[in-house]
Amino acid sequence: MGEGAAGSWYVTRDEVERGSPSRRDGVGAAKEAELRATYCSFIRDVGLRLQLPQVTIATATLLCHRFYLRQSHAKNEWQTVATVCVFLASKIEDTPCPLQRVIIVAYETMYRKDCNAAHRIYQKEVLEKQKELILVGETLLLSTIRFDFNIQHPYEPLKLALKKLGIFQMEVKQVAVNLINDAIRTTLVVQFKPHYIAAGSLYLAAKFNNFRLPSDGKVWWHEFDVAPKQLQAVIQQMTELFMGRNPCSMGPAIRPPPTPSLMERQQVIRPPPTPTLMERQPIIRPLPTPTLMENQHITHSLGAVMRHTHSSIRSLSNNFDREASRSLPLNIPANRKSTVCPARNEGNQSLRMHMGHSNGSDARFEKQYSRGALKADHVYHVVSGQKDLHVTGIRDLVRQKRTFHEVGEHPAPIDKSDTKSWIRKRHGRNVIVFDTKSSSWKKQKL
C-alpha cells in the first residue's frame, strides 16, 4: 500500500480482509464487517437528522473507511470516529453544521433506546466533555488521512455516462444510484475508483431491468474509461454483496418518511369523495307541515302586522258589519245599506254614517279590514233612516237624563224604556241602537 499519494487509498481485497490494523489487534473479519455496517448506518441516521445531502453522508462514510484502513477498531471507538467524520465531512462538502448540534444529534442517536441517557447531553459538563473529545478526534482523523480532501464519488461519472449514452429510463437510473449507495457502505470504495463502481452499477441496473445498453459503434464501458478485466472484477464483487437482494429495495439516497401510525392515519385529512351524478342533482324536499302551535303563532303574527299597518280608525270587524247590515229596518231599501266607519277611542271624534254605498264597496272594506282593535266597554252602532246622527249627542242626552234622576249623592235607577222615550222626544226621529257587548245582537227601535 503506497503512502502519500491519492493511489494509496485503494487496496486489494486480500489486504482488506487479512492485513488491516484491526486484524493485528485480534478483531476478526466478521466482527470488523459488523462494526463497519454499524458505523455506516449510524452516519446515515445522523446525516438524515441533520438534513445533510447524500454527498455529505457519502463523504463521511468514506472518511471513516479510510480511517480504519490505518487505525484499529480495538483502539478507537466507532461512535466517536463516526461523529468526527460527520463534522469534518460537513465542512469539506461546504454544508457546515455547528459542532454542538452535531454532538447533540449524534448522542441522541446513539442512545435512542434510552431516553434518560439521551437527555444527559443537555447537561453542561457532559456537553463540554463531548466537545473536547470530538475536537481531539478531529485532529487524529486529519493526521490519519494526511489532510487529503480529494474525495470523489461514483455519482458524477454515472451522471455523465447516462447523458452521453442517452439513457433516460428512470428505472435504470434509480437502480444504479441505489447500487452506488450500498457500495459506499462496503470496502468497494477503497478497492475501486469511483468510475469503476459507476460502470458496474449501470451494468447491473440494466441487467435487472432487461435494458440493453446502447453502443453507437463502440463498447458502452468506454464511456467510463475502464478495462474489461477490472470491470468484471467489480461486477463480480457487487454481485456477491447484493446476491439474493432486490436492487429496488436497496436504500435510496434519502430514506422515505416513516409509515404513519394508526393515530396519525386517523388525523390525516382526506378530501371529500367526488359526488355521483345523482348526488350532484339538487334534491327538492317538501317543507314540513306546520304544527298547530306554529299555525297559531303565524296567525297571531299576521294579525299583529295588520293591526300595526292599518289605522285603528278602520278597525271594525267584518262580522260586525255583516250583522249590522242584516239588522236594518224593513222600511229601509237594500240599496241604501250603509257602511259604518269604526269609532275612535277618543270621545271628541264623531262617527259618521256613510249612506248609499254599493255592495262592491262593502266587499272591499270587508276584505281590507279583517278585525278591529276596539277597546271601548260598550259600543253602539247607530243607523238612521233620514240623516246622520251624532253618537256624542245621544250620549250627552243620556247623561242629562241621568242627571235629572239623581237623588242626593246616589243616582236613582234609570228606566231604559223611559230613557228611550226621553231621547225620542229630544231628537224627534226614529233611531235603531245595537248593543255589541252582549252575547246576542239586540235591535231596539227608539
UniProtKB/Swiss-Prot annotation:
InterPro entries (alphabetical): Cyclin-like_dom, Cyclin-like_sf, Cyclin/Ssn8, Cyclin_N
UniProt KW Cell division keyword: yes
Disulfide bonds: none
Short name of one Pfam family: Cyclin_N
SUPFAM superfamilies reported for this sequence: Cyclin-like
GO MF, any single term: cyclin-dependent protein serine/threonine kinase activator activity
GO cellular component terms given for this protein: cyclin/CDK positive transcription elongation factor complex; nucleus
GO BP annotations, alphabetical order: cell division; positive regulation of DNA-templated transcription, elongation; positive regulation of transcription by RNA polymerase II
Keywords: Cell cycle, Cell division, Cyclin
Family, per entry: Belongs to the cyclin family. Cyclin T subfamily.
Protein name per UniProt: Cyclin-T1-1
Source organism of the structure: Oryza sativa subsp. japonica (Rice)
Gene behind the chain: CYCT1-1
